[in-house]
Regions:
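Sec-exported extracytoplasmic/periplasmic mature domains
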Residues: 69, 73, 104, 120-128, ...
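Bacterial N-terminal signal peptides that target proteins for export
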Residues: 1-9
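N-terminal lobe/hinge region of extracytoplasmic solute-binding protein
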Residues: 39-90
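Solvent-exposed, polar/charged alpha-helical surfaces in well-ordered, non-transmembrane soluble domains
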Residues: 45, 62, 66, 93, ...
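Surface-exposed binding/hinge segments that line
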Residues: 132-180
Length: 180
């Protein structure tokens, strides 16, 4: 009897193993290249990169948006949307970035003005959430307190591919701050 049970169990394990190795011939590759499936441990509250305060939304945005820099697998900061390291003024206050070519999901080009829009939204007191971490940008603190309009933020699009960031004070940690 024991020998029969062992044979049945061995046969079952082999059958399950072979079934797991097989392919699903009914699956379709239609739009498979255009779809990303991810699991989160909680409900997403937003996909607005300037208006989140929960971990699931933050994790998801880290997967779908990219900053001027990104954190590599070795936990080191590397270029993201920046095509090359920025030109930095002698006083360490002005950073000029050239953006690499990239497109939004609708096919339109990512432009420097998109970054300006996002950074302005981050410090705009009328948007609800205001990021104190953006206080490194020129005038950010005064904008957050309502003393200046968001247009005075030290972030400017010089053209479609060139972004200029002016700081209040030198910030050697700026690349880490500008990760997606």
């Amino acid at each position: 009897m024991k020998k029969t049970i062992k044979m049945l169990m061995s046969s079952l394990l082999v059958a399950v193993g072979l079934a797991a190795c097989g392919s699903n011939s009914s699956s379709s590759s239609t739009n498979a290249a255009n779809r990303l499936t991810m699991t989160t441990f909680g409900e997403l509250t937003t996909l607005d990169s300037a208006d989140y305060d929960d971990v699931p939304s933050s994790d998801m945005m880290g997967q779908i948006f990219e900053g001027l820099y990104r954190v590599a697998a070795n936990n080191k900061v590397e270029l993201g949307m920046a095509a090359q390291e920025p030109k930095v003024s002698e006083d360490g206050l002005v950073y000029t970035f050239t953006l690499r070519d990239a497109k939004w999901s609708d096919g339109s080009a990512v432009k420097a003005q998109d970054f300006v829009f996002t950074y302005r939204k981050l410090v705009n007191p009328q948007e609800g959430h205001v990021a104190q971490s953006a206080d490194v940008f020129k005038n950010a603190k005064k904008i957050r307190s309502g003393e200046l309009p968001v247009e005075e933020l030290g972030v400017k699009a010089l053209d479609d591919k060139t972004l200029e960031i002016t700081l209040e004070n030198p910030a050697p940690y700026l690349p880490k701050l500008l990760t997606g």
